[in-house]
């Protein structure tokens, strides 16, 4: 097998912004086999130790322009002057990525001598570059070293990448729906495949050879079967769906030497870039087709237009700059070094525009509904604009919610990258940093939305309350509603003078805040008369079991210190088992029960994935997006689940009909492992102390 000669050292080493590809090796200990023509010449050369050139340095940029301006005839003349065979001419000159089908793969061809020669010599000794795994056993399982070699020899022309971006025909809404549906289907196939392998393994226990074959199958899956989430995005207007389907990738031969896991990582990073291009296209359509429509400008008052579109221009400007940097990273090499360093920088310095936009969501939705109801001209014009083929049948509301969907999806895309990078590597550290920054942005967005809606909700509740006891201030910046609803209070069997039994239960209404419980009775005029209250931390609950049909779904609520500074006990009946469980979970979340214990962290905890989106109807419910994975903490007989979402650890109730259970224990274990890896930057000592406090509070009860 032919290999690079010493001139392979001529390509300047590629470095990312966060120095992810630092030089970590000394002089090469092994040299690849050289052709007879060049072996003697190379042996007589004195070893040189050169400092690698930074990717964006002035020298490196000048060299790239110089090589780009050089004509093909000049390059051939240089090759002939170096006594190279005609059949081994280089096809990897910087920024000249025209790869004829008849030429040899680029890792077999020499490059020109230049800075970074020392590490190029080491990289040329990796498997796939002329040395077999038997000759270099230490490098057999070293995809990172192999990737560093590839980083130096595969530039991609800017025009090729820009053409790819322009040919993306999917709007972001289409991409998002198809991507999540494909993710669900991929999990189903993996679940069924691994279950099939497990069944086959058990059936062949008596045959040692068959057992070994079955164990090897899941460990070495076919390289092309591990498709990323974007693989179903087939579209007549978008030729390229996968990184490995790009003509430059196909003709370069890198797929023959990349490890399968590195290929998956490349696909994950490629999806982040192409999805950002699709998102920018949808934002641009929102601005050009809707916001800047002259007829719409005349219909809307400036204040209405400001609330409706908010700072979408700022969001689009940030997306444009973000996409431009991602494009530049793609142009540098077909083998992508990293994108998380760019994501981290933008999340830390520029993504605050998303917080501003999303925080306005409550007013935006209300204004949009009012305009549709009150302004006929607005409603008719929007309907007309939505019929335009550009919109592909999508409503304006789907465009207005794009920024919040994107910032959430971006965090998941970084998680997908994080799952595939090498553990302990610098790329893992950068991905963790990017994920942490994105998580902070998403939390700030959620808090912004909640703050706006909570303030209005607290004002509305305060107006409806009449206090029979000492008044309690309801409105507070640190207080919000967790749950409200009607329950039946058991008053006990009492007999009137006419010997007719009074009603065993009577209705009461509860308002549960994050720090306060208010117990009321509903009175005419949509008002509530408050007759008792207690701090939430002084509540205890107890479930009554096997008490017959009359006491079904009954639980005891104990106030350790109520409004009169006394202990009070209420026997309450809910309308269903799920309603009882939901009230008990909300009233005393730290009580000693199985659905708020550490079972969410156990490997045998049941899991489900969301197959139908669900919007929370109550504060204690959890909004679900397609492909969300959740641990089951509690499941009721009437079809409700209390679960914890893995990617953000949010808890809440949701209908079981919106999900399907993941049956295979290997898939569940893998999901938990990936979850632990994503969130491992959290302080373990802090989590341990928090768990100890929870355990202690339950033991005291």
From Swiss-Prot:
Compositional bias per record (Basic and acidic residues), positions renumbered to this chain: 1-11, 26-48, 679-690
Region entry Regulatory region: which residue ranges? 1-264
Please list where the region (Disordered) is annotated: 1-141, 187-226, 679-701
Q: What is its main location?
A: cytoplasm
Segments forming domain SH3 = 603-664
Q: Which residues form the DH domain?
A: 264-448
Task: Give the sites modified to Phosphotyrosine.
Answer: 172
Q: Does the keyword Cytoplasm apply?
A: yes
What tissues express this gene product?
Answer: Expressed in telencephalic neurons (at protein level). Expressed in brain, spinal cord and testis.
Q: Which GO terms describe its molecular function?
A: ephrin receptor binding; guanyl-nucleotide exchange factor activity
Its localization reads: Cytoplasm; Membrane; Cell projection, Growth cone
Instruction: Show the ranges annotated as biased composition (Polar residues).
Output: 120-132
Please give the InterPro entries that the UniProt record associates with this protein.
DBL_dom_sf, DH_dom, Ephexin-1_SH3, Ephexin-like, PH-like_dom_sf, PH_domain, PH_ephexin, SH3-like_dom_sf
Assembly description? Interacts with CDK5R1 and EPHA4; activated by EPHA4 through the CDK5 kinase.
Quote the protein name from its UniProt record: Ephexin-1
What the entry lists under SUPFAM superfamilies is as follows: DBL homology domain (DH-domain) (SSF48065), PH domain-like (SSF50729), SH3-domain (SSF50044)
GO BP terms: cell differentiation; ephrin receptor signaling pathway; negative regulation of dendritic spine morphogenesis; nervous system development; regulation of actin cytoskeleton organization; regulation of GTPase activity; regulation of synapse pruning
Q: Which organism is it from?
A: Rattus norvegicus
- Record key words, sorted: Cell projection, Cytoplasm, Developmental protein, Differentiation, Guanine-nucleotide releasing factor, Membrane, Neurogenesis, Phosphoprotein, SH3 domain
Summary of the function given for this chain in its UniProt record: Acts as a guanine nucleotide exchange factor (GEF) which differentially activates the GTPases RHOA, RAC1 and CDC42. Plays a role in axon guidance regulating ephrin-induced growth cone collapse and dendritic spine morphogenesis. Upon activation by ephrin through EPHA4, the GEF activity switches toward RHOA resulting in its activation. Activated RHOA promotes cone retraction at the expense of RAC1- and CDC42-stimulated growth cone extension.
Asked if the Swiss-Prot or TrEMBL record annotates the protein with the keyword Transcription, the reply is: no
Name the Pfam families for this protein.
RhoGEF (PF00621), SH3_1 (PF00018), SOS1_NGEF_PH (PF22697)
Q: What is the UniProt domain comment for this protein?
A: The DH domain and the PH domain are both required to mediate interaction with EPHA4.
